[in-house]
Amino acid sequence: MPSSPLRVAVVCSSNQNRSMEAHNILSKRGFSVRSFGTGTHVKLPGPAPDKPNVYDFKTTYDQMYNDLLRKDKELYTQNGILHMLDRNKRIKPRPERFQNCKDLFDLILTCEERVYDQVVEDLNSREQETCQPVHVVNVDIQDNHEEATLGAFLICELCQCIQHTEDMENEIDELLQEFEEKSGRTFLHTVCFY
């Protein structure tokens, strides 16, 4: 088992649903975890598929909650968005962009391939300073409440297994293969360096 706790980041596009559900579950399990989005803006479903609610990453979850409450309380209660924002504001004040974070992590989990590509591209564009490895793993999770919950438990189980390895560098590939077979999902995995 690693001598220090695993430093984990979970990343989706808007730091709202998938990354926050995983953040919530991982922090309840005692992990050192942060969550992020990679998008240029935060997007939440609106009254129609072509009319999303778009916010800046500086907007707090509380401000988004109050804005949607004012716009259409019934719609955003029924589709679960207000409930999700209520959970989010109990975890942290506002969404965060991965590209603006300079903290170091041991493991970064992304929730879709496009986000994985953005995270890897960002890490590879940074100047290497410490040569400390960071494992980036993609777990494809559909962006809905049910899949976010299932995906969060899978991410949590994966983190618990990695936390208990003797040698993460040499055991992670085999571990991911076991998880692929067990879950029926395919994981992308690469190593970047800080």
UniProtKB/Swiss-Prot annotation:
Substitution effect: residue 12 to S: Abolishes phosphatase activity
Residues spanning the membrane: none
GO cellular component terms, semicolon-separated: cytosol; mRNA cleavage and polyadenylation specificity factor complex; nucleoplasm
One BP annotation, GO: termination of RNA polymerase II transcription
Subcellular localization, as worded in the UniProt entry: Nucleus; Cytoplasm
Any coiled-coil regions, as ranges: 160-186
Keywords assigned by UniProt, alphabetized: Coiled coil, Cytoplasm, Hydrolase, mRNA processing, Nucleus, Protein phosphatase
Enzyme's top EC category: hydrolase
Protein family (similarity comment): Belongs to the SSU72 phosphatase family.
Quaternary state and interactors: Interacts with GTF2B (via C-terminus); this interaction is inhibited by SYMPK. Interacts with RB1. Interacts with CD226. Interacts with SYMPK.
Task performed by this protein: Protein phosphatase that catalyzes the dephosphorylation of the C-terminal domain of RNA polymerase II. Plays a role in RNA processing and termination. Plays a role in pre-mRNA polyadenylation via its interaction with SYMPK.
Name this protein carries in UniProt: RNA polymerase II subunit A C-terminal domain phosphatase SSU72
Organism listed in the record: Homo sapiens (Human)
Gene transcribed to yield this protein: SSU72
